[in-house]
Amino acid sequence: MERIKELRDLMSQSRTREILTKTTVDHMAIIKKYTSGRQEKNPALRMKWMMAMKYPITADKRIIEMIPERNEQGQTLWSKTNDAGSDRVMVSPLAVTWWNRNGPTTSAVHYPKVYKTYFEKVERLKHGTFGPVHFRNQVKIRRRVDINPGHADLSAKEAQDVIMEVVFPNEVGARILTSESQLTITKEKKEELQDCKIAPLMVAYMLERELVRKTRFLPVAGGTSSVYIEVLHLTQGTCWEQMYTPGGEVRNDDVDQSLIIAARNIVRRATVSADPLASLLEMCHSTQIGGIRMVDILRQNPTEEQAVDICKAAMGLRISSSFSFGGFTFKRTSGSSVKKEEEVLTGNLQTLKIRVHEGYEEFTMVGRRATAILRKATRRLIQLIVSGRDEQSIAEAIIVAMVFSQEDCMIKAVRGDLNFVNRANQRLNPMHQLLRHFQKDAKVLFQNWGIEPIDNVMGMIGILPDMTPSTEMSLRGVRVSKMGVDEYSSTERVVVSIDRFLRVRDQRGNVLLSPEEVSETQGTEKLTITYSSSMMWEINGPESVLVNTYQWIIRNWETVKIQWSQDPTMLYNKMEFEPFQSLVPKAARGQYSGFVRTLFQQMRDVLGTFDTVQIIKLLPFAAAPPEQSRMQFSSLTVNVRGSGMRILVRGNSPVFNYNKATKRLTVLGKDAGALTEDPDEGTAGVESAVLRGFLILGKEDKRYGPALSINELSNLAKGEKANVLIGQGDVVLVMKRKRDSS
């Protein structure tokens, strides 16, 4: 109080006021503090002080020609004195108002294109629905989220090249536009921004927003896709949340979502094939998501999900060093361990060989609906702090942590035999056996774990074996917390290796991921996923297998035709016929195959024309291992549309219908393509029939001279073509086989 009184007295003297307002500041340290560097030290004060002046703005000299000296109210708009530090004019804020009202206008056509992301955001908010506000404790955990809806997924370098090419095409400097997306975007943007008058720098900034994914590590409870993150400040506070439904979707969220679905489908399918790794790569390379190659998306998209990471590992890309177990992402935050093989006995006296982690370690566990901190020693859980959305989610996290701890009481809690298998009918490894067992029923596990009295700690409560909360007792070492555990924030990626069974290991040999970790959740993709690989035909059901098999034969007819006559065994073993076998009744597969192969052999041996259409129709049936029998069939059954449908050996049926006039094939009413004529070989196809040692190429071709009789054919050299008279006066073009075949 004394000091304030003293100041009041000082201020009442006019000399004090004069010193404070009139004298110059000449202390070097102060001058340095406020004048060094370009960064404004006190922006708010500077703004107030500038705006109090009459002419706080400077403008280019040309402005005098374009703006009157006074406005309609007679207020001066610019000063006749030049700005001291430059050759610019001093201008009043009123000049800006005048310019905005009366200045020259320019075409607005480019604004929505350049500021596309803003215009789209306004639309999303306009059509979004805001629901009621709920007050409750928010369990937020920091996750790495995409904060920029509506972007492509280019790397910073790729985007930089595109921006330079679009905005500053005449600047020097090497720019390499290689990826498909780079080229498409560049072409599209150049067309959109022709004659654009918006400042190039602004255009460049806005393009960057459109091309590059920007992520931040933010506390989130609820939706993490970018259309939710853009309204984070409106939807969740410390103790409240507001319901919100976005008024539109953006492609980048759709890509992320569809990528996860495609990757899961591919990993699941690869697991059951003979060589999972080769199959997985074949499928990744032949799949498109929303019209873009999946491998291109994998290279650019930072989504971390088990199946996506397995695909990335297979492609030799780096992935996060965290590992996955029971659907939770584990990240070791301290400690270390060595792994030793140990044999343990379950409660059912079954012997399990497990890899025991010896040593003290701490982990964070992050799942979709629950998070936890786990401290463990060798085969012992020391402490588990869990938080989650609901009882169910918390229980899931506790089970995973208990199994991961490898404690003896967990192994002894097993009742019954462990014989869980994966999709390929292979036994799961022991840790996943235990996990599946307790995920089905954890009652015994929780009952046998043991409970302990607990201290009263802020923000923590206990949880009982029946998963009810308690302030007195809790499962041994387990506590439930109100606070979530943050996701691992680092974006560091490590080099990994993958074996043919799709197990992903880091360079120390620790397993980070395996197909067992891939979620079984089925979703509907937002973007069209096109699987070109025959391995994925069955994903859309039996009809799709049928149509795709015949489409494949027709598309590849030229090569199929030659193999059919020269190397049928190789043809029958093609993987494209694998999915078809699941449609043929098990009991009939071998008989059908034997029947069709015999029929085909007769066609190769016996004189006379034969119908391409029939070969195409019956070919898929010949792929199964044949049974030798004298059985004859007039129709073959396939299981589609929930029942057996017949394909007639001779003639059309609803399943397989060939229209001679249009040369088009329909399978189950869907168009399966046309039998095209081969320009080199007349009508290779429709009349293709076979003489022993000769391939019939099609109708007569006058270029090869008059028709020979069958006896004269023996004079032809291998590979030579000739017209020949067969059957009922038909003349066809044949070629002597290059090699003999039965």
Curated annotation (Swiss-Prot):
GO terms for biological process: 7-methylguanosine mRNA capping; cap snatching; DNA-templated transcription; symbiont-mediated suppression of host cytoplasmic pattern recognition receptor signaling pathway via inhibition of MAVS activity; symbiont-mediated suppression of host gene expression; symbiont-mediated suppression of host mRNA transcription via inhibition of RNA polymerase II activity. Its main location: virion. Keywords: Cap snatching, Eukaryotic host gene expression shutoff by virus, Eukaryotic host transcription shutoff by virus, Host gene expression shutoff by virus, Host mitochondrion, Host nucleus, Host-virus interaction, Inhibition of host innate immune response by virus, Inhibition of host MAVS by virus, Inhibition of host RLR pathway by virus, Inhibition of host RNA polymerase II by virus, mRNA capping, mRNA processing, Viral immunoevasion, Viral transcription, Virion. This is Polymerase basic protein 2. A motif (Nuclear localization signal) lies at residues 736-739. SUPFAM superfamilies: PB2 C-terminal domain-like. Belongs to the influenza viruses PB2 family. It comes from the Viruses. Influenza RNA polymerase is composed of three subunits: PB1, PB2 and PA. Interacts (via N-terminus) with PB1 (via C-terminus). Interacts with nucleoprotein NP (via N-terminus). Interacts (via N-terminus) with host MAVS (via N-terminus); this interaction inhibits host innate immune response.
